[in-house]
Amino acid sequence: MLPNTGRLAGCTVFITGASRGIGKAIALKAAKDGANIVIAAKTAQPHPKLLGTIYTAAEEIEAVGGKALPCIVDVRDEQQINAAVEKAIKQFGGIDILVNNASAISLTNTLDTPTKRLDLMMNVNTRGTYLASKACIPYLKKSKVAHILNISPPLNLNPIWFKQHCAYTIAKYGMSMYVLGMAEEFKGEIAVNALWPKTAIHTAAMDMLGGPGIESQCRKVDIIADAAYSIFQKPKSFTGNFVIDESILKEEGIENFDVYAIKPGHPLQPDFFLDEYPEAVSKKMESTGAVPEFKEEKPQPQPKPRSGAVEETFRIVKDSLSDDVVKATQAVYLFELSGEDGGTWFLDLKSKGGNVGYGEPSDQADVVMSMTTDDFVKMFSGKLKPTMAFMSGKLKIKGNMALAIKLEKLMNQMNARL
C-alpha cells in the first residue's frame, strides 16, 4: 500500500459522505498525516443496516492522529453545507481539500426509475457536488494545496453505460462534467480532478446491490484512499484529469495489488463506465480463443424433449433468428442452467440461420453463461438486467465478454415477446 509522507499535516479536508465507506477511508488516510477532517454526512444516529455515524468516524480519525469535526450535512440542503463550511473555517481556519464523495445510486432503467428516485440522484450527485464546491471554493482559492476531488467516472459516451441505468449515469456524469468546467475556470488556483475505481469496491452499497458473496469479487476501500492521497500530493497544475485508482498507483510504484483485494487471487468485478470493461473481464475469465467466421450449417445435436419456461424461451429465440442476427453476432453461447428445467443449452449464432438446442453445441462455445433457470428467463424477458446479474454474482461468465455483451441486443428484441 502507499505509505504516508506527512505532507497533509495541518491541512483541512472537507469530505461529503465521510461517515463510512470510501469517504471514511479517504479521511483516515489523510488523518494519519495529522490532517483536519470535516466529516460532512447525514448519519448522526446509528442505522439498523449500515454501520457508522459521523461521531464514530470522528473517533476513528482522531485515533489515528487526525483532528475531526463531525457535521450533520445532507448535501441536498445548501444551508447545512454552508453551516458546515463556516464551522470548518472557525475551527481550522481554512479549507485545503474538498472531496465530493456523497452519492446516490439506483441501477434502474427509465420506466423503472420513479421521479422521486431520479430527483434523489440528481440532487445528491449532481446538485450536491455543485453546492459543496461553490461553498468551499472561496477558501480553497486561498490554499497552497487547493484540490477538489470528485468520486465520479470518466466521461464515456458508449451507449451501453446509459441504456440500463440512464438516470444514474447522467447524475454521475454531472459530477464528472464539473471537473471539465471547474478545472478550466480555476486553473492555476485549484486542482480539480475525478477519481474512479477500476474494479468493484467493497462497501455497504455494494453489499446491497450485489448480495451475499459479492465481497470476494471486490477490492478494499483502501485502494481509493491511497489513490486519492496520491492526487492530493500533486501540484495545482495536475488538473482536469479522470484518474483510475490502479493506474495512478502503478505510477507511484505499486506492483502488488493483491494487498487491496478482499480475497487475493479471486477474479475481480470491473466497475462501470470503463472502456476496457470487456478486456478487463475477459482477462479474468477462461477464453476459448475462437475467431469468429461465417460457417455453413452443420448437424446439431437433437434437442432432448423439455417442457417449461426455459424451452419456451428458446423456442421464441429460435423463431427470432435470422442470417442478419447471425452475421451481426458471430458467436456460440452455452448456457449452464441450474434448478427446475435446467441443464445445458446452446445458442449457435455462427452457423447459417442460427440454431438453439439442448445439450452441447457442435462447435466450441465462445461464451459460457451459468445461472439459475429463473434468472435465465428473467434476463430474456427483461425483468433482470444482464449487467446487474453479472455484477451481483447471479450470472457467471466464461469466455469472450465482448461477445457476451452482444447477446444483450438479442435479449432486448425478445423482451416484447416473452
Curated annotation (Swiss-Prot):
Chain positions found as N6-acetyllysine: K116
Q: What are the residue boundaries of the SCP2 domain, all occurrences included? A: 306-415
The answer to whether keyword Glycoprotein applies is no
Q: Which residues are recorded with the post-translational modification N6-(2-hydroxyisobutyryl)lysine?
A: K42
As one GO molecular function, the record gives:
oxidoreductase activity
Chain segments carrying region Disordered: 287-310
Source organism, top-level taxon: Eukaryota
Q: What is its EC number?
A: 1.-.-.-
Where does the record locate the signal sequence feature? none
- InterPro entries, A to Z: HSDL2, NAD(P)-bd_dom_sf, Sc_DH/Rdtase_CS, SCP2_sterol-bd_dom, SCP2_sterol-bd_dom_sf, SDR_fam
- In this UniProt entry, the residues modified to N6-succinyllysine are K318
| Localization of this protein | Peroxisome; Mitochondrion
Annotated NADP(+) binding sites: G17, A18, S19, R20, G21, I22, G23, K42, D74, K172
This protein's GO cellular component annotations are: mitochondrion; peroxisome
Q: Identify which residues the record assigns to the active site.
A: Y168 (proton acceptor)
Q: Which family does it belong to?
A: Belongs to the short-chain dehydrogenases/reductases (SDR) family.
UniProt function note: Has apparently no steroid dehydrogenase activity. Controls bile acid (BA) and lipid metabolism in response to nutritional cues.
Q: Matching PANTHER family, A to Z? A: HYDROXYSTEROID DEHYDROGENASE-LIKE PROTEIN 2
From the Swiss-Prot or TrEMBL record, give the protein name.
Answer: Hydroxysteroid dehydrogenase-like protein 2
